[in-house]
Amino acid sequence: NTVGTKSYRRYQNSGVSGTLANVSVMESKIGDQLNITLRDEDGNYVKNQFSLYDQNGFVENNFCEDIISKLRNMKKGETYTIYTWLLSPEDQRSYDEDTAGREVRAKYYDRRGVSIKSNGERVDNYIKFETDDRPYVEGGNISPRIKWVENKAKPGKKKKSAASSEKRSDFFITELMEAVNGH
């Protein structure tokens, strides 16, 4: 409300479920937002909102790339459950140590993403990520990979190439606009 005395936000620790009503991009004071609107079993509309861009102006790669990758495999009117997740460095290291054949790395970082299920089954990515065996092709459903370059300000360190970040971001925005047209 305008007075700020009542919050309409509800935090869901076990995911948000409902029938897919709409997917849209909305401008706001805090930047463009990717909105996925579900209609719950009580008929209430539940808006799941994610910042579309990171602080560098590229598509946010924790949640939005993940969501956009799945949109073309989602249909309006079907029921979905949306979960956000966080995998801590400690959990990743523990998993690698406990799993045969996994290499334990020197350093781990937080990993975040979104899982979407329909009827208990995972919604697969429509967009695949570029690998050595699966190259990026203009107009296809393979996203271009980020290229890492030497950081001249910090010798011995690498940073993301701005050109490859922009190319990847443009790919995801184009894909989002095409997917949203169907919602």
List PLM regions with ranges.
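OB-fold ssDNA-binding interfaces and closely related basic DNA-contact patches used
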Residues: 1-55, 59-72, 88-153, 159, ...
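Acidic, gly/ser/pro-rich intrinsically disordered tails
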Residues: 152-183
